[in-house]
């Protein structure tokens, strides 16, 4: 969830790169030191294999034995994503935060690829759907975002960067967090003013 969403909490601090802290958490995990495999394929998203290798280098610098397993594009979304315990993935935007959270993070979601399960998160999501007080609803989404950041298993190196250049001579334009050119709808929703 990023600033394209109206209920985004811009006070959530970005995590800093801290190999010493990562090493501390890894040692405390009790992991046996065997290689941790990160599955990636070029088709996961543009630059997925490079991103996985950069992440592995950062993890290795902290003493975490992460290795990248290159998977074929063919069958990646059927045989690797949401099957392998640790793999590269790509999420495009959704029209509203509720849909993103419901699709990927609520405990019962079929596409919950991090296997995140948190009863408080689920309760907040359900409550926020029916909350009419805008400030309270924003606070509920903020609490959900904090829970995800602190307890979720997602490693998020970047957000999609949709750069929109629009002339003053174009009418009907609205920002859309789902994709470039109003999620592909600019040609049917906009006109020359």
What are these regions (language model features)?
Residues 19-37:
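Immediate post-signal peptide segment of exported/extracytoplasmic ligand-binding proteins
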Residues 33-35, 63, 152-154:
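Short secondary-structure junction motifs
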Residues 1-7, 23, 44-56, 74-193:
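Detector for C-terminal structural segments
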Residues 65-77:
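Early extracytoplasmic/lumenal segment of secretory-pathway proteins
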Residues 54-68:
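Short alpha-helix C-terminal cap/hinge motif
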Residues 33-43, 66-69:
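Short, well-ordered beta-strand elements
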Residues 11-17:
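DNA breakage-rejoining catalytic core of tyrosine-based enzymes
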